[in-house]
Amino acid sequence: MNTIHDQAMNYVYQQVLQRLLSFFSRAERTALQLLIQRLVVAAGGMERMGEYKVMVTPSGTRDSCYMLALLRAAQLSIAGRAPATFQLRVATLRRSESGTAALNNMHRSFAALFLYDDPRVELLMVEHRQVLPFNHLAPLGMDSANAHRTNLLMMGHRRARGEKLEWRDDACLARAEFYGQIARWSNGVDAWLASESPRRQKQFVEDLDRAVQKAGIGALKPNSGTFDELFALLDGLGGDLYRGFYSESERQCWRPEGGFESCRRTTFVDIHDMAVGNLEERWPLLSEFLGFEAEEWVFHQGEGEYADPLIEAHLRGLEAEFISDRSYEAGFSEHVQRMLANMQLQRVPEPVCEQMIARLGQRQTTEELREAAASWLHQTYGLNEAQWVCLLFTPFIERGAGLERFLRSCHPGMLVALPDLHRAMQGLHGPEQVMQWMMDVSGLPVRLIGHLYAMEPLPAHGAARQTLETALDAAGLDGSGVGDRSVER
């Protein structure tokens, strides 16, 4: 670049900074100065800032877009007062459930913050273990969707008896693998910045410990339960956290090959204490400056966590109907009550609670909501209701210990083929119709079903995770109608 162009761009960047700062409160400006000081110390002094590379991994949520804006303000503030500022790597993980709203939110944030075309900034997207330039318009590849579906099923079928189906196992494993590899790619980064609280850091590490055990690659080494040791833990696990499920020829390597050999040591910089104020105070920055738009079905589910309550309630409804011999409506309504109680405990704004009730309890019948959830799950993962029900039963692990119960409950006509099913899962010859039925009902190829057949379930997770549910049960949340319960503090 020539000097005139550099001067022009520096002027543009300073204008962006001034507009960004105009949305900051006094407390946020103080937090910005503390963030700058923290980065200077981590880099080893202002004179080394130009060589320092920082990574963030936004997901398109309100919190991630807000923290990116704060970090960009720090980068541009340092650029205005020092010879050089830090380099920034912005990397996002693309998965089947990565909705267009989240990608569009990130794109609008990147554009508003002038991250595109800034040579100090890398904008990356990882899909199916391939590092690509960020592109919010790129469709999800078929290979990526197929791999994600298979990983989700394999992790889900490794649940302990009586353990509820949750999204966190596969999501946690995928994100951990992503963090470890994207931090090493192309000469690596010096620091990863994240705003998770100590409680959420501990929860992630605990979830990761259980997830790697489900994936068949052992347990984590003893650790402090914080992100300070996360990269050391990930280095010890290796780059392929799903290798316990697949043969060497079936595994997909990280690409571009040879780009993940960096020995640069990545440290964690905790910025959870930099998020000051509340959502109402941040909303002008999010909506007017960053162009953030929330999808109608996204509700706040606690500290920095976002989920689709319709899908979660749908799965609980299926569990009630097929596993617990209750009605779908009872399981669905009970879970909505639990989510609402959790939101109240987290002091989520009243209008948000009321919005969830209106979305899930009044305007549509339960059958309409069930159809909407089933349609989304099929479009997103390519799995029909019968395949989700199969996953709820986990009939294949432990040498098919739960297979007969599954057949009696859902497919009594296949009981006559029970011996053939066991032989097929043992890798022996079986009737073609039986093999095809196994694939149709599970969504998995027979060879992977056979792999599950030889695996043991993990022990139950323990009583800790059930503490909240026990407390909610004691409070009388017994699955009564959503619309019958007022939202009171």
For each predicted feature, which ranges?
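A phosphate-binding catalytic loop at a beta-strand-loop-alpha-helix junction
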Residues: 46-80, 286
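Nucleotide-activated chemistry modules centered on ATP-dependent adenylation/adenylyltransferase
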Residues: 1-51, 87-111, 117-489
